[in-house]
Amino acid sequence: GYRKVEWAEDHDLFLRMMRAGMRIGKVEKTVLSWRDSPGRLTRTHPAYAEEQVWRMKAHHLSLESRVSARGVAICGAGPIGKRLARMLKQEGVQVRGFFEVNPRRVGEKIGGVPVAGQGEFGKRWRNAVLLSAVGVEGGRERVRELAGAEGYTEGVDFWCCC
């Protein structure tokens, strides 16, 4: 059931259910008519703020055995990737590196973690779990393509985080 957490309790429940092996699906017929309003909790309560959503993602990722054992490599060294890396480190996850397409970022270190170029994708940090943190339009699909071509399996050793 629900528990007291700093983030959205319903999302937390769904993530715990999925980790426990439960499946979530869509019911084909309408069972509830939903009214949305500007005063809705998901738009006004601090537990639903973007920062808390990322904390929840980092927390639940840190509980994945592959993530805790192998660490992660993050696709995207922009604001989203940096935020995710910082929060994962706070959860005790080893961030092994970033992959980035911007040539100005390649070779830098972010929080002591190296940034590699696209040419090293699938070779460097290959044992780490791959996380996509690319927020630009089409970014998720592009990383998903590259990950699949390199033998990553989504939901096993690769996740899209945004």
Report residues per predicted region.
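Rossmann-like AdoMet/SAM-dependent catalytic core
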Residues: 56-66, 81, 87, 140-144
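Hydrophobic residues within well-ordered alpha-helices
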Residues: 17-18
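Catalytic core of nucleotide-sugar-dependent glycosyltransferases
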Residues: 29-37, 43-68
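Short hydrophobic segments within beta-strands
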Residues: 27, 74-75, 99, 131-133
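Short internal beta-strands
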Residues: 96-102
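Acidic donor-binding loop at a coil-to-helix junction in glycosyltransferase catalytic cores
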Residues: 6-13
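Phosphate-bearing ligand-interacting subdomains
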Residues: 103-162
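Glycine-rich adenosine-cofactor-binding loop
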Residues: 69-89
